[in-house]
């Protein structure tokens, strides 16, 4: 059980709540030119370059998505098509939640104020949020904060907007590298790692582990 009453439960969205399909779309897009291990290398390089693209000054999410794929294609010596790359970006608002999410969030929303902090575009995120099946107190984007996670600025922006402190929230994510390592460094004591399979558990960062969002609700007594 989680023996803590947060003022807010703050969530990462893409990957944690929304089923993030960039790897799937990359496989579909390049499956005719790469196979097996080479295709998976491209997928992995694309993920890595996306992380690298968000570490500097803020830029539109479209540029993050497209630039990272351009770099991954160069690394794998395959042809890059910017029009095709933009299709990945434009698909983002069509993606819905992991199957467990609506039930779990609905249970949590009966008691807690739910908040999203997402590496998202302002003009895309609401479409994803509308598919989650529960009300949110606030939704904050990297575009609003002018900074992407894992940089700290987005978290600091969220705390300022909510008029709260790191100690007041339970932050929930399926990503150590984008969220929970930064949350640890910011002094967010209460964190939950949702085991979606993108990253291995790293207990050093001191979080609760849950299998899905209903499991999180159960750990909070709901």
Give a label for each model feature.
Residues 64, 68, 100, 104, ...:
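Charged catalytic carboxylate motif
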Residues 2-99:
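N-terminal helical cap/lid subdomain that shapes the substrate entry/recognition surface
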Residues 1-8, 37, 106, 112-222:
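Asp-based, Mg2+/Mn2+-dependent phosphohydrolase catalytic module
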């Amino acid at each position: 059980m989680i023996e803590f009453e947060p003022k807010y439960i703050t969530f990462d969205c893409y990957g944690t709540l929304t089923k993030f399909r960039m790897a799937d779309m990359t496989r579909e897009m390049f499956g005719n030119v790469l196979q097996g291990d080479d295709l998976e290398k491209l997928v992995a390089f694309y993920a890595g370059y996306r992380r690298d693209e968000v570490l500097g000054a803020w830029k539109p999410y479209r540029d993050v998505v497209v630039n990272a794929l351009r770099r991954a294609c160069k690394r794998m010596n395959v042809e890059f098509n910017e029009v095709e790359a933009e299709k990945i970006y434009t698909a983002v608002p069509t993606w819905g939640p992991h199957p467990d999410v609506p039930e779990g969030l609905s249970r949590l929303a009966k008691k807690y104020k739910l908040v999203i902090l997402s590496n998202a575009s302002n003009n895309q995120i609401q479409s994803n949020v509308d598919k989650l099946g529960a009300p949110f107190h606030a939704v904050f984007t990297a575009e609003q904060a002018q900074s992407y996670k894992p940089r700290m600025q987005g978290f600091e922006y969220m705390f300022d907007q909510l008029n709260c402190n790191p100690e007041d929230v339970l932050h929930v994510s399926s990503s150590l590298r984008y969220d929970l390592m930064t949350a640890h460094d910011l002094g967010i004591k209460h964190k939950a790692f949702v085991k979606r399979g993108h990253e291995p558990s790293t207990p050093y960062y001191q979080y609760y582990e849950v299998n899905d969002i209903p499991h999180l609700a159960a750990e909070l007594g709901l």
